[in-house]
Each structure stands twice: as structure tokens, then as C-alpha cells.
Amino acid sequence: QTPHGPRFGAEPPVEFAVRMRQFPHEARLDRCLQGGRLGVENTRQLAQSIAGFHMTLPPRLDSDPDFEVERAVRPARNNFKHLDPQVFGDEAQQRLAVIEAWTLAQASALAPVFEARARSGAVRECHGDLHLENLLMLDGRFVPYDAIEFNPNLRWIDIANDIAFLAMDLLARGHSNLSFTLLGAWLEANGDYDSLEVMRFYLVDRSMVRAVVSARRAGQAVETTAGSARPGAERYIQIAADLVDTPTPRLILMHGFSGSGKTWLSNRLVPGVPALRVRSDLERKRPQAGTGVKSKTEGVGLGRYRADEIDRTYGRLADHCRTGLQAGFNMIADATFLQKRHRQWFVDLARSLGSQCWLLDCTAPEEVLRDRIRRRAETRDDASDADQAVLEHQLSHYDPVTEAEGMTVVTLQHDSDPDQVLQDILERRNIN
């Protein structure tokens, strides 16, 4: 072999510089979605995988916060420079005008938030192009590929921006249930509920990015304005318009003793309402994240079950719900809510924001509760630390819910059919 006459693959390799593996196209997540192989449960696993990936990335703490703000808002502003409204129909033109006005207003209003998130380490070297076509399901795990390499400004972004692209892609494909499942599980895994302040901005931005890409493919961009509007671009414009024009969100409280099925039901409500969820079982442990201290039940009145710690947990849940509601997301607070004063915090919160407050009262006979707690302790497959002692304390120390508390109360039995429960909540009870 010579430089002028190289031969490839003629001899056994001595060492690989780069060894690539060809993947089956059916492994792409867009194909999995089309084939019905991407559902709620593995979307939760996908979200947890992405959250884990984001948490391993070193934050960028040495850049100018003003530059980070500009990096967040400039692409969103520029989207509208690359679209000529005249090539779209009248309705799409009106939507574009509304979206642009909203984007400019939000870019200004959120500038302090973008700066604060940059200072807190939310800006990291992310994937940058995280949508379904750039994700694989291989050998039971999720594998991202084709990350952005050519432009550092497109990959050094807020982790909320990274996940927003995938959530928007699911919305665009008509799967709002999976989109909210993804966002909800991502938030529960990393605890970054503050990201909800900017999440809608990034969802709209990512939708407009895809509108620009679709327009360019159809010859609709400013550079080549000839051609009629392509449905793809208008579809993304419609999605962005829907994200901008959100109805008043609702606050849903799960209520009941440990083992009554609150989390089981809220797992189904997240994609069904749809809504985002905060769980007391996760939030009470959040301060210990990364300390290496193994989670364990410390007993009634001790550790995380001290009265002041319980108040702190409910306060954290309320803060997260406030952030989500103010950002236009339906929120579910999954906790026992056995004390009237804790319920009142959330009723007052909803009232202050003009939101409805619903309480879903999950009930079960005491023997069923005790059996579930026993089986949970044996399997150890639940985030709850509640044991028999905690349950017995709850059964003797609770404030019954009354109509005077100002909530819409729905009582649910432990043996209710899950599909019927969801239909009752969403349709007859008119939550959605």
C-alpha cells in the first residue's frame, strides 16, 4: 500500500482510531413513537436518563452573565427575522405577530431569571439538538447521538433549553401526554422546578426554530420567499401560539393516608390532565441529595418527620407549585395533606393566582393501608419512607376535610377502576 494507492479493509485491523456501529433505523425514537413502542413508562425512564446526563455535566460558571442572557434571548428574537409572514395565511400571520410580541416581552421580563440560572450553574455543555430523531432505544437503554459540535453557543445552554426541545417535539407529534410525562419525570429526578420560570419560553423558542427549518425546506424563508406556506411550518407556529395562549392553570392536591394510592393515581393524572407533579416523598429527601446518606425512615417526630421538617417540606411543595402555576402549568401536589393548615396554604396559593384548587381524597380501609405499607417495606420499590408507625400516627392525628376549606373535593375509593377514575376527573368533574 502507498499513499497513492491505498487499500481499505484489505487486512485485519491492528487498532481502531474510530470504530462506528451502525444502528437500526427502527431504534430511533421517532420510529419507536410511530410504532407504539414509546409509552408513558419508558418516557419516564428516558426523562430520568436525560436528567442523570444533565447532572453529570460540569456547569459553566466563568462566563459573563450578561452574555448568557443575550445567548438565551438572541436566537429567539432572530427566529422572526428568518420568517416572512407574507408567505403564510392570514391566521398564521396573526399568530406570528402574537408570538413575536410575547417573545420580546418575555425576553425582557425573564432577563434576571436567565442571569440567575447562569450564575447557579444551569448553563452546561448539553446535547443542543435533543429531539426524537437524535435519540435511540438500544438494548433497553436510551442513547443520544448527533449532538451539536460546530457551534459552542448552541450546546452551552440551560439544561431547561435542552429538555424543552424534546418536550416540544412530543407536543408537535400530538403526544402531550408523553411531553408532560417527560417534563414531570425530569423535574422529579433533578428537582429543578425553578426551570419552570423559563420552560415555556424555551418551548416556544424551540417550536419557532422548527418552524424556521420547515420554512426553509419549503422555500419560505426570507432568503427565498417564493412558494406557498407548508403545513409543517404552520403547524409549529400553531403549537407556539397554543403555548403562548394558556388557560388559567389548576392546582390539584392529592390527599390521604400513606398507602391510599395517591401516587398511583397521580402517576396517571400527570399525562392525563396533563400536569406536572411535586412529591413530598421526594422533596423531603432533596436536601440530602449528594451527601451519601442513605434514605431511611427515622420514626415519627424524628428527622424528616419532625414537625418543623414537615412544614419545610410543605413549604417547598408550595414554592414549586407557585412557580409552575405562575408559568401556566397545571400542578399536582402529592402529599398526605392531613393537616388543615397545610391544605390552607395551598388553597390560599391557588386563590392568590386565580386558580381552581381541587382535592382528590384517596380512601381505603385501614387493613388495606396496613397491608400496602407492609408489602411496600418488603419490596423497597417506593420513594415513601412511611412505615407502620408513621401510618398509625397518621390515623390518630389528622384533620378531616370540610366544605368550608374552599376546595372542590372528589372522594375516590381504593378499588375504583383507574380508567373510570381518570374519566370522571377529566370529564364529569371538568378539571381539564
What is each model feature region?
Residues 378-426, 431-432:
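Small-molecule kinase domains that catalyze NTP-dependent phosphoryl transfer to phosphate-bearing small molecules
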Residues 265:
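Hydrophobic positions on the alpha1 helix immediately C-terminal to the Walker A/P-loop
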Residues 257-258:
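The conserved Walker
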Residues 254:
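Hydrophobic anchor at the beta1->P-loop junction of P-loop NTPases
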Residues 289, 296-308, 351-401:
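A glycine- and Lys/Arg-enriched "phosphate-lid" helix/loop adjacent to the NTP-binding pocket
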Residues 262:
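Conserved lysine of the Walker
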Residues 5-132, 136-250:
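ATP-dependent phospho-/nucleotidyl transfer catalytic cores
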Residues 270-329:
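Conserved substrate/cofactor phosphate-moiety recognition/catalytic segment
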